């Protein structure tokens, strides 16, 4: 079996808009052949964004969300290609959902490529220490660390998080569904999340559960 590198997965993701794990699985299925992987994703309905990936998305919206009582605030910039789509109900609904996702799930980055090598290495060191403290054999520790790093990405990277309205999908998969529906590239560019009293000693409330409950109400 051909070795599937991170750069191959990244390229396939950029060309198709499919999720990171979907890209990795596709490459594994076709022995690392990029063009066959694209065809595989299209056949599976996971590459609706393929033809849009190279387009420029310079329109869009900055969506805001304030959680009840003004305790959490989010601003997120989501881009599309035309002003017409920026006013589209589905696009605006997506922007609102993503803003609420950020409020509830506390991502630190949009995508895994934004996570610095230093942060990843530091996280790996912590995970190695945890595995060894659990009494795991050293020979399997590295495999365990790689698996836990994937879990780390799903926690801190917005696009890889389970979508708060449907945990069977990732945020990226939801975006791809909108891309297929509206026919334009959609890209989350950046976000900022504020939480009242963040960094200060205070009573701990489960804000994520509150936001999730509000969404389902």
UniProtKB/Swiss-Prot annotation:
Q: Which residues form a coiled coil?
A: none
Keyword Cytoplasm in annotation: yes
Which parts of this chain are annotated as the region Involved in Mg(2+) ion dislocation from EF-Tu?
Answer: 82-85
Could you state one GO cellular component term attached to this entry?
Answer: cytoplasm
Q: Superkingdom, according to UniProt?
A: Bacteria
Q: Give the Gene3D superfamilies listed for this entry.
A: 1.10.286.20, DNA helicase RuvA subunit, C-terminal domain, Elongation factor Ts, dimerisation domain
What the protein does comes down to:
Associates with the EF-Tu.GDP complex and induces the exchange of GDP to GTP. It remains bound to the aminoacyl-tRNA.EF-Tu.GTP complex up to the GTP hydrolysis stage on the ribosome.
* HAMAP family in the record: EF_Ts
Name this protein carries in UniProt: Elongation factor Ts
Gene giving rise to this polypeptide: tsf
């Amino acid at each position: 079996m051909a070795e599937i590198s991170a750069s191959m997965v990244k390229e396939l993701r950029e060309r198709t808009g499919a999720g990171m794990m979907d890209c990795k699985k596709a490459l594994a299925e076709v022995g690392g052949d990029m063009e066959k992987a694209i065809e595989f994703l299209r056949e599976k309905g996971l590459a609706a964004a393929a033809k849009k990936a190279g387009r420029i998305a310079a329109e869009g919206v900055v969506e805001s969300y304030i959680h009840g009582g003004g305790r959490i605030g989010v601003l997120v910039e989501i881009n599309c290609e035309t002003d017409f789509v920026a006013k589209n109900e589905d696009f605006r609904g997506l922007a609102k959902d993503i803003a609420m996702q950020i409020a509830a799930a506390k991502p630190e980055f949009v995508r895994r490529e934004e996570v610095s090598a230093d942060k990843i290495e530091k996280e790996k060191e912590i995970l190695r220490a945890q595995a060894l403290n659990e009494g795991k054999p050293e020979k399997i520790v590295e495999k365990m660390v790689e698996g836990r790093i994937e879990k780390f990405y799903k926690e801190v990277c917005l696009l890889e998080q389970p979508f708060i309205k449907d945990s069977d999908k990732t945020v990226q998969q939801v975006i791809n569904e909108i891309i297929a529906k509206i026919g334009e590239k959609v890209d989350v560019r950046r976000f900022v999340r504020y939480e009242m009293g963040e960094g200060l000693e205070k009573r701990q409330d489960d804000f994520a559960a509150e936001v999730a409950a509000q969404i389902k109400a």
